[in-house]
Amino acid sequence: MHKIVFVTGNKGKFAEVRDILKNFGIEAIQNKDGYPELQEDELEPIAANGAQYVANKLNMPVMVDDSGIFINALNGFPGPYSRFVEDKLGNPKVLKLMEGEKDRSAYFKTVIGYCEPGQEPLVFPGVVEGKIAYEERGTGGFGYDPIFEYNGMTFGELGDEEKNKVSHRRRAVDNFLEWFIGGA
């Protein structure tokens, strides 16, 4: 069985990725130590840099995830700053920013960064389109899940099993697996 260190302190992210990878004979090992995060306007360099840093530090294959919600009416805000905005403002204030906005379209994007020690990092994006709900709905998931609507239901309403079939993270991990299994 392949082993990959997945660097995140987020229990929800780890559980989602672990459950996907185990179906392909890959054991995800959680590492909560983190890494110096670049301040960039794009997710790809953040994920690539983090994966390379930790792979070289631990001398093991490493996967990191950088994700964001991009709200079109807010010019892509909060984007790569989603975690900071969630911590400082939370969903209620994001909904307040959206008051009166007709364009509620948004997308979640995850970029998986993967690196083996001494190698160049690779990135695997995944995107899911949706819209911002008018209120928080559902108790499932984490982060922006209760305000991100996909096919009429928020990710918070879908439940983990259904969400994990269609999420941005699932799509990014699937892109990684296509490369990893195809090249393994």
UniProtKB/Swiss-Prot annotation:
The UniProt entry's GO CC annotations, sorted and at most eight, read: cytoplasm
Q: Which GO terms describe its molecular function?
A: dITP diphosphatase activity; ITP diphosphatase activity; metal ion binding; nucleotide binding; ribonucleoside triphosphate phosphatase activity; XTP diphosphatase activity
For this entry, list what GO says about its biological process: nucleotide metabolic process; purine nucleoside triphosphate catabolic process
The answer, when asked if Metal-binding is one of the entry's keywords, is yes
Pfam families to which the protein is assigned, alphabetical: Ham1p_like
| Record's keyword terms, sorted | Hydrolase, Magnesium, Metal-binding, Nucleotide metabolism, Nucleotide-binding
Q: Which residues bind Mg(2+)?
A: E37, D66
Record: active site: D66 (proton acceptor)
Catalytic activity from the UniProt record:
XTP + H2O = XMP + diphosphate + H(+); dITP + H2O = dIMP + diphosphate + H(+); ITP + H2O = IMP + diphosphate + H(+)
UniProt key word Cell division = no
Binding positions (substrate): T8, G9, N10, K11, G12, K13, S67, F142, G143, Y144, D145, K163, H168, R169
Cofactor(s) essential for the protein = Mg(2+)
Q: How is the cofactor bound?
A: Binds 1 Mg(2+) ion per subunit.
What family does this belong to?
Belongs to the HAM1 NTPase family.
Quaternary context:
Homodimer.
Descriptive protein name: dITP/XTP pyrophosphatase
Species of provenance? Methanosarcina mazei (strain ATCC BAA-159 / DSM 3647 / Goe1 / Go1 / JCM 11833 / OCM 88)
